[in-house]
Each structure stands twice: as C-alpha cells, then as structure tokens.
Amino acid sequence: MMLEPSIDKLLDQVDSKYSLVVLEAKRAHELRDKERPTKEFKAVKNTLRALEEIADGTVKIHPSPELKRETLVEKRELERLQAKMKEQLIKEQIAKEEAEEEAKQKNSRAAKAAAAE
C-alpha cells in the first residue's frame, strides 16, 4: 500500500523525517482539538489529514517556538474577549426584551384600570 501523499513530497516541505513526524503529530492533535483545517480533506483520520496539509504546504514548522507561543496566547485572549463581548450583547438584548415586556404589561394594566373606571 502506497502512502499518499508520498514521503518524498512530504520531505520537500520539511528539513528531516524527525521534523515531519513532530509536525504531523502536533497538527493531528490540533485537528483533534477542533482547530480549523486549512483545506478540504480526502482522509478521515487526523494524522492523514495533517500529512495532506503538510504536503500542500499549508502547515509549516514555526521558525520561533517563543513567537508561536505568543501568537497562540494572543489568539486565545482575542477569542476570550470575543466570547465576553458576545455574552455582553446577549445580556443587553435580554435586558432590553425584559424592559419591553415590562412596559407592555404596565400599559396593559393601565388600560384595564382605565376601562374599569
């Protein structure tokens, strides 16, 4: 059985077999943890999906691990802030709807009281 993509094509993208294995494993873990894929896959398994991405050149070894960590921290902070903003918007929408409902009930009671007089 031939490996697809071929080892030669994969080694064109990285410096060594060791680097290839490490990159594949890390990317497979990212895909497992629901990281966004960079392309549509033919394969079902995350390890083979990672190899497809490496062969296409859409996934690379980051030249500076420290810079990658900083980038990931910034990305997670941005995601956290976006989630917080979304939550705040939902809370504001709920408060607005509750205020509108309260105003309707108040108007309804006032209309009933006026009709009863």
Curated annotation (Swiss-Prot):
Pfam families in alphabetical order: RNA_pol_Rpb6
Keywords: DNA-directed RNA polymerase, Nucleotidyltransferase, Transcription, Transferase
Enzyme Commission designation: 2.7.7.6
Catalyzed reactions: RNA(n) + a ribonucleoside 5'-triphosphate = RNA(n+1) + diphosphate
Transmembrane spans: none
Region spans: Disordered: 96-117
Disulphide bridges: none
Database matches in SUPFAM superfamilies: RPB6/omega subunit-like (SSF63562)
One Gene Ontology biological process: DNA-templated transcription
Annotated Low complexity bias: 108-117
Record keyword Metal-binding present: no
Role summary: Promotes RNA polymerase assembly. Latches the N- and C-terminal regions of the beta' subunit thereby facilitating its interaction with the beta and alpha subunits.
Subunit structure: The RNAP catalytic core consists of 2 alpha, 1 beta, 1 beta' and 1 omega subunit. When a sigma factor is associated with the core the holoenzyme is formed, which can initiate transcription.
NCBIfam families recorded: rpoZ
UniProt family annotation: Belongs to the RNA polymerase subunit omega family.
Protein name per UniProt: DNA-directed RNA polymerase subunit omega
